[in-house]
Amino acid sequence: MYTLIKTEGKARRGQFETVHGTFQTPCFMNVGTAAAIKGGISSIDLKNDLKCQVELCNTYHLHVRPGDKVIKQMGGLHKFMNWDKPILTDSGGFQVFSLAKLRKIKEEGVCFNSHVDGRKIFMGPEESMQIQSNLGSTIAMAFDECIDNHMAQITPDMDEKAKNRIIRKAYDYSKNSCDRTVRWLYRCKEEMARLNSLPDTINKHQLLFGINQGSVFDDLRLRHMEEIAKLDMDGYAVGGLAGEPTEEMYHILDILCPVMP
């Protein structure tokens, strides 16, 4: 449960209560991709010296190795890591979609090859939720497509006709992707509810956050936020802002923050 403590202009300070403890917002999430911080930092150091409130772990990498089922057998990520504070797991979507030459997108999900051993893996909304449930994280992220920034193909010396062609193609792709991501979110929510009701689920109070997409197109971003807000998720994130120019990132945040739940 989120509690708003104070606001100042567009900024707000609050706290988020979870089954694994409370963290203050805004907060910095330390990244432990494979359930550990690089550099030999122990969980004790992370808590006592670095004052880490939330650790972020990577669903895709943990699924590939050591395997989410192995981690479940060990009691979940908290026991695996010797960590008793909140953990957020991403959906694996960003990593999957970054494997551009190794994956194929379908309505059901994504087929791709492991970057480790080349084996074929299928991941869709249900599979992502199942993996994250096996990990037992505090907060799970919905499976979405992290859309490539096709606008980066535009160069200063390009003529207007070529620019418009790229923009139109990027817009159409982004729109179709957003629509699919909404459908995937419905499937994620349904599967998470099912998993949280099972007797052998590690964290029966696992939270699920929806992710806003829409590339750099204002109308797509706003429409997508409106659609996913209807599902009344436990929280929301702004996705796909990785690699865009800083001014575009700030612009997207400026138009989205006032309308986010």
Predicted regions and their residues:
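Non-catalytic, usually N-terminal nucleic-acid engagement modules in DNA/RNA processing proteins
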Residues: 1-201
